[in-house]
A protein has these predicted regions:
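C-terminal accessory region of SF2 helicases/translocases
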Residues: 142-143, 147, 151-160, 165-295
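Helicase motor core with emphasis on the C-terminal RecA-like subdomain
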Residues: 1-200, 210, 249-250
Length: 295
């Protein structure tokens, strides 16, 4: 490839129709309020849509066979484990919320059927509760929300998954449930993976070992950046995302994130949400959260 004949095109990471929000919580059995909050929030969405005459008119004009419900709303909930998919989707259905599980443990036929019904907004398939196995190559325009049930392993992964919302250009919510318990759990897992990887790489030696070390260091730094993004309560989420990806002069979103909507109220919500957790961030702030190898 001749560099003199190539051109680079760089698009902005900013999508102003996405509303980013971090929900602070505890994932201990006593303090975990994620499910009750989620059900209440979803029920409010269903009620608003069902009682909106304009929405009913819009749906009737789109479909002549009355197969699409006025209150239907498409969403994705990302969870870390297959068991979480099954349990959470079952609990949502018990609360009369159409949800289906999608993970690698299902057969190809089951996954395809689930995906097709969700894309078609079939009854009972408003929401897909999925692991990260879901989403690649799927383009459903009217996804109104993406929820991360726990902290993802990387900033890039979070941004890509959240970006599956609102592809039709209309407003969509990107919610991330954040707890310091999750942060520490994922951090320990990454630290362990780094240790194991370094051990294998040292055995190989040479350039392979150096490349692996760089890769794992980048992985740790990406996760640290995402945890910092969640902890921040003093800046626009869109600005923080843009700066992570190297954009300059990203403007504040004007009410398309929790900071720009809530201001000082976000700090209080963080204090209240994380009050039951023990603050153990000193290691992270000293940048040795993942061990001495990346000091």
């Amino acid at each position: 490839m001749d560099p003199s004949t190539t051109k680079s095109f760089i698009a902005s990471t900013t999508r102003r129709n996405l509303v980013y929000e971090v929900r602070f919580t505890s994932t201990s059995d006593e303090g975990d309020n994620r499910f009750s909050w989620l059900v209440s929030w979803l029920q409010q969405i269903y009620a608003r849509r069902a009682n909106d005459p304009a929405r009913s008119q819009e749906v009737s004009e789109e479909t002549s066979d009355n197969t699409k419900r006025p209150d239907a709303v498409s969403g994705i909930i990302y969870v870390p484990y297959r068991l979480d998919c099954d349990v959470l989707s079952s609990k949502l259905r018990e609360n009369k919320i159409g949800a289906a599980a999608y993970h690698a443990g299902l057969s190809t036929t089951e996954r395809t059927e689930c995906q097709d019904r969700w894309i078609a907004s079939a009854p009972g398939y408003d929401i897909i509760v999925a692991t990260t196995a879901f989403g690649m190559g799927i383009d459903k325009q009217d996804v109104r929300f993406v929820v991360h049930w726990s902290l993802p392993k990387s900033f890039e992964g979070y941004y890509q998954e959240a970006g599956r919302a609102g592809r039709d250009g209309w407003f969509a919510r990107c919610l991330l449930f954040y707890s310091r318990e999750d942060r520490d759990r994922v951090g320990r897992r990454i630290s362990k993976d780094i240790g194991n990887s370094n051990g294998h790489a040292i055995g190989k030696g040479g350039q392979a070992a150096k490349d692996k070390e760089i890769q794992m260091k980048s992985r740790a730094e990406s996760f640290q950046a995402l945890a910092k993004y969640c902890e921040q309560t003093d800046r626009c989420r869109h600005m923080a995302i843009g700066e992570f990806f190297g954009e300059k002069e990203v403007k504040a979103c004007d009410r398309a994130c929790d900071f720009c909507m809530e201001g000082e109220g976000l700090k209080k919500r963080k204090r209240d949400g994380l009050a039951s957790e023990e603050w153990v961030s000193t290691q992270m702030e000293r940048s040795d959260f993942y061990g001495d190898e990346y000091d």
